[in-house]
Amino acid sequence: MVKQMPHEFDAGMKVTRNGRFSQAVFNSYDIPFDDIYESLIKQGYIPGVHIKTVVFDLTGKDVDRDVIKEAAETLNEGRSYVRFVGDFMVVFLYTKVARDFTTISHDRIMSSLDETIHRPFDVLCGISQMFEDLHEAGSAFKQALYALEYRDFYRREMRIMREEHYEEIAAGAAFEQVVPYYLVEESCVDTAFVDFCLSQAFLTTILADDIRNNTKNFQILWFYLAYECNASSVGRRMFMHRNSVLYHLKQMEKRYDFSLERRYFREKLMLDFRLVFMNLSEASLNTLFEN
């Protein structure tokens, strides 16, 4: 018998992707490498230094492009090259010297992106990983777009975890932060197969049992994995004694026949959780994790 998501959450089920960033969309954008390379060289860029691509989504925004471009050019102490590609403002941030891993690190640039672009212009951004070869700008552009697309899912997860940098994600997200969601969904293009995976995941059964029995095993299991198997941290988060956390976990292992001692199972379970999260509305997720 195929299990379904608990009916209490049926209204919250949602389509996770709107198709804006499909492969066809990627192919429709022309990234003029030669032109960008020449412009960067004139600006002081030295081949071999580190680069990050930041993509701001201007879709539907009444923004003066000259004004926002001028603001973006002040980022990273002026080591910033700005290019408009369709409805996106693409910003290349680069370091002064090679092997400089700190100047454009995530922590360094997020506050300036928030203060200089996000707050004044109300636009979101996605950030690529650091790279060196400018000819890889197309892949970095993809990473930044995916960061934009999966930002909301990551932000919801951080709110559940009550992470200190939750507000920081308001400005945007880095690809490194959203990659679990990218891997989950991009590897599951067969929707019938995804539905099968979701229906057969015992997390769905745990969630249904929680609703029926007014228990919180779903939350306990998520926090245990998210806190790297630290029962004390779970106890503090859920106002329980660590021994109670361990007791509930043991009961789950026995009832649903699994073992958290197996690393591969824990890794798979984290992906299953994110698959469930992506198929719940934000309201349903908030209800599920409210204390």
Residue ranges and their predicted role:
Residues 2-8, 17-291:
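Cytosolic nucleotide-utilizing catalytic cores of signal-transduction proteins
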